[in-house]
Amino acid sequence: MTYPLLGRIQAPGDVKRLQESELPALCEEIRQFLIESVSATGGHLSSNLGVVELTVALHRALDLPQDKILFDVGHQCYTHKLLTGRMAGFAELRQKNGLSGFPNPKESPCDTFIAGHGSAALSTAIGIARAKKLKGEPGKVVVIVGDGAFTGGMVYEGMNNVSQLNNLICILNDNKMSISKNVGQMANYLTKLRTDPKYFHVKAQMETALERIPVAGNAMVKVLQGGKQLVRRGIYHSTMFEEMGFQYIGPVDGHDVLLMEQMLTNLQEQFAPIFLHVVTQKGKGLKPAEENPGEFHAVSSIDLSHLTDPELSPKDSFSTVFGSTLAEIGDDVPELCAITAAMKYGTGLNFFKHRHKERFYDVGMAEEHAVSFAAGLASQGLLPTVAIYSTFFQRAYDQIIHDVSLMHLNVLFGVDRAGLVPGDGETHQGIYDPAFFSQIGIPVFAPANYAELKYWLPHLVKDMTGPRAIRYARGNEKEALAALGCTGNLFDKIDTRPGAKVALVSYGAESEEIIAATKLLLQKKVAADAYKLTRIFPLPEGLCEALADYDTILFAEDAIRTGGIGQQLGFALQQAGWQGKYLLHAVDNSHLLHASVAELRKDQNLDAAALAADVLACIK
């Protein structure tokens, strides 16, 4: 497909050269390009399809990079990247050395801030707007906040400190979805704003009448604006956004690009921070994504002619196996509850909801609340499981320590997307959880295949004696690890060679690499055994004794080195009196850029070739 209008945009500001009459066609081209491109490379699809017109209007009304645009969450930035001259880069979207799937100031001066986690961008925008004021710099600061972000508490902390910043515009992208369908009272409140005809018919009539009053000078403008506020509040209730210091405008049609451009242009002269409520449709332009936007939030490369219903998708992954197994356990354990933070599909808990709706809780984009809520349930004798991506558990670390660990409550943490995560880059890596769970004494299990996940999950639920964590990789099990099955042991020797004086040790998905490394070593006439840990903290009883007779031990983990399991094993061996050579391979650069898992492993010397080479160099 050709893109004659989009192809004319080679640099920031080029979109302003198009005629107004060309804008609807441009938006259609952008939407079709995104569908074609993202279906080939993978990426965040449905959210980007929903903000095309809004982003085009912003780029027409603003002057980038003097004006600043922030995204909450950053994955809705694809149209922004197209309009700043990065169309060619989409062929390598989210691939190593290619275009990031999130805003990145290193990639373009038009990318204001990295934003991979939700509810934070308004606070950042307030800081940037305040800095512009202090430094006397011109320009607006615009933050696009998805309605899902309003299920997280941090956005309200920002609203509470907005003050009188007349260079700040907050745009609520209200698509009635975040990643899974929005939940809670905020979602209900926005629905009321969208659907109350009396509220907005009266508002429209009154605004039209007031706009007809002649204006004489800036002083009169301010008087009239104050008068309009009084009339407005006398006829209909003010919104919560106005009560917090914003001038509220909306809801407006976020897919009317001409209306949006006119409105954003008119808002350049403002006397208070603006809250613009824009209604969009997530997944617009792709019928399956419109009907099931959660399924198309983040996609791998897809065949658009063969699409499935996400509610009970048959595709196996660690997430779906976790969710379906937990649902089965719930049949026999009435105390079991399941909690997620706006990631019902991503964590596989849609299966639990289908069978135990009354015990399923989606708390929205509120990880801190999810953990403290689980603590409350556990304190009353229930057995909550909190399933959240590893990268998002970071947001709830205080609650894990203070509300769960100190109380020694029976809470199970399902740590999804643990280890190296492809595509999304530094904001979504799951490399910190082994260190931060173990530092506060929470036992951590790391099944390497589905069989182990299915075995350990019911054991952890039914034998709870305090908090536990079970971590598992993104995607599906690997053939070499699936072949191992499940022994039910806390650690296993998974490969053995007669007379081996070298041992390779790992856990989880990285175990595949040590199996491959033993084969590479054998080609060099070096016999090596391989061990896989299932419980990684505390270290399994008998592990140090099993390793005592080896001259060289290499430990590999796809998590950070400092405070990680490898350092803990090295110390334990030393304390046990072992005096051999200890090699540790772990993640040294904690900010990993977007790439495939294989590329990330190679960059961090966690691939089989690097492990084998280190052993060979050590034993020479």
Describe each model-derived feature in a short phrase:
Residues 92-124, 134-138, 164-295, 311-354, ...:
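Thiamine diphosphate
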Residues 44-166, 335-336, 340-341, 349-350:
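Cofactor-binding active-site loop characterized by glycine-rich and histidine/acidic residues
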Residues 43-47, 113-117, 148-151, 362-367, ...:
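Alpha-helix N-cap/helix-initiation motif
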Residues 2-82, 242, 253-257, 277:
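N-terminal amphipathic, basic-rich helices that act as targeting or association modules
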Residues 141, 145-158, 348, 360, ...:
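Extended, hydrophobic alpha-helical segments in both membrane/secreted and soluble proteins
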Residues 297-306:
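Surface-exposed loop/turn segments flanking beta-strands in extracellular/periplasmic regions
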Residues 39-40, 51-60, 124-129, 152-163, ...:
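Short alpha-helical segments and helix-capping/turn motifs at coil-helix boundaries
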